[in-house]
């Protein structure tokens, strides 16, 4: 028998009963599955904890087949007892210490970042302190440990407030016991917590490889935002593509005041948002209406890969934003060179344009303030802002095919159009008034 005990405090995962604060962001079944992912990660983590392991579970019918299947043999199982969460934790600690253990630490399971080193540190610290408590970033606590069962810290009236940690620490010290604040972690209770975990994963291989990380990546919510203005010739074809290949994504069309039948042609199965005219304004309005973790800005004259949602998710495992790159629906030599230059600029210089299918972490989009609402060059300004902040786009394996409608004509007319587009960008880089450039560009958006 080890001198130390570690209690994993959880419940039997049941759809509609567990992680309910994540609904409707996740379905009841997904809430159950992410809870199972937490338990898988805790099983693996607990193998490196220098203590005997106890799993205290809650179950409405007393049965715990999922918990048992995940943790297997080698741990001791007990059903939680008590009238509320505080008394249940106290009774678990009291029961385990009554078995003769010198010290005991208890944690919940919705802290997928928790490391075994932190649990061992808490147990080690009980050699010198009466109690240890680990704060969560939302003001609660994820860990509590004791050498003797003290009931007062568990008599709180409210366990869902931002003062739980402080009230618990006050209760311990008011009784004359010594207490150490140990490592702070963030838990996962809300969709915001999911998004913060997603961003943390991109720089932490351990989190990406965890069962929780793999689940979150595979179920990342993608919002497809399509700004439209007089697109009756293209909007039906894009909807056909999206109905086929975006079944698990949110699709939002943002109409900037079309004077043709564009808005009427948009299927009620997609969300239609009205906004002022201007692509930047429309995309920002779409982002405000979106619920996804990842925002994908798509032009209406695009042809997208069948598996574009999975390609976005794959890139976003390691990157905060990315793009598809572009190819054109023309074999014209000058369009081929345009493709090469555009993709080189996106991936080597970090300046993707809008027709290359930019997608971005929602939190990062909000952090930089979205698109600057200028009449033209909003994509250049957006990418430049990200590059200045140190962000470079990730690259998908496939390309978006975009229309060459702006380049119609004979070869010399294509060259003239290419030159005009280059000159517009050059003027913008050199500080010419963007409104003057927009007048030269013409009213095509």
Set out the residue ranges of the language-model regions.
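Short, well-formed alpha-helical segments that are part of the catalytic scaffolds
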Residues: 14-46, 230-244
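A conserved acidic beta->alpha catalytic loop
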Residues: 60-63, 255-263, 302-303
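Conserved donor NDP-sugar-binding/catalytic core segment of glycosyltransferases
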Residues: 125-132, 306-334
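Hydrophobic helical membrane-anchoring modules
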Residues: 202-220, 384-445
């Amino acid at each position: 028998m080890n001198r130390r005990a570690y209690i994993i405090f959880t419940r039997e995962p049941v759809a509609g009963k567990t992680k309910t604060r994540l609904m409707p962001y996740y379905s009841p079944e997904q809430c159950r599955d992410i809870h199972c992912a937490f338990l898988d990660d805790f099983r693996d983590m607990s193998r490196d904890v220098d203590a005997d392991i106890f799993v205290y579970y809650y179950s409405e019918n007393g049965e715990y087949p999922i918990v048992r299947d995940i943790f297997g043999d080698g741990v001791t199982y007990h059903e939680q007892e008590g009238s509320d969460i505080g008394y249940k934790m106290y009774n678990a600690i009291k029961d385990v210490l009554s078995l003769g253990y010198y010290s005991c630490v208890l944690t919940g399971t919705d802290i997928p970042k928790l490391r075994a080193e932190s649990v061992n540190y808490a147990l080690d610290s009980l050699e010198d302190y009466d109690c240890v408590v680990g704060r969560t970033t939302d003001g609660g606590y994820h860990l509590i440990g004791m050498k003797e069962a003290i009931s007062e810290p568990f008599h709180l009236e409210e366990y869902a407030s931002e003062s739980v940690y402080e009230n618990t620490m006050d209760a311990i010290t008011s009784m004359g016991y010594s207490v150490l604040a140990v490592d702070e972690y963030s838990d996962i209770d809300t969709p915001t917590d999911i998004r913060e975990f997603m961003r943390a994963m991109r720089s932490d291989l351990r989190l990406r490889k965890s069962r929780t990380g793999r689940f979150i990546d595979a179920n990342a919510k993608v919002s497809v935002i399509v700004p439209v203005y007089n697109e009756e010739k293209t909007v039906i074809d894009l909807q056909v593509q999206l109905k086929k290949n975006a079944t698990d994504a949110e699709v939002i069309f943002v109409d900037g005041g079309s004077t043709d039948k564009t808005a009427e042609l948009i299927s009620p199965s997609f969300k239609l948002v009205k906004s002022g005219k201007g692509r930047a304004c429309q995309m920002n309005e779409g982002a405000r209406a979106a619920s996804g973790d990842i925002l994908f800005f798509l032009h209406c004259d695009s042809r997208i890969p069948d598996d574009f949602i999975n390609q976005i998710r794959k890139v976003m495992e390691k990157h905060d934003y990315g793009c598809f790159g572009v190819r054109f629906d023309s074999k014209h030599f000058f369009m081929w060179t345009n493709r090469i230059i555009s993709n080189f600029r996106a991936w080597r210089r970090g300046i993707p344009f809008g027709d290359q299918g930019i997608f971005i972490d929602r939190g990062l989009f909000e952090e930089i303030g979205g698109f600057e609402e200028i009449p033209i060059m909003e994509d250049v300004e957006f990418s430049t802002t990200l590059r200045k902040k140190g962000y470079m786009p990730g690259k998908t394996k496939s390309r978006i095919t975009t229309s060459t409608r702006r380049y119609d004509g004979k070869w010399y007319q294509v060259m003239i159009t290419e030159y005009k587009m280059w000159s517009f960008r050059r003027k913008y880089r050199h500080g010419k008034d963007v409104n003057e450039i927009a007048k030269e560009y013409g009213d095509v958006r």
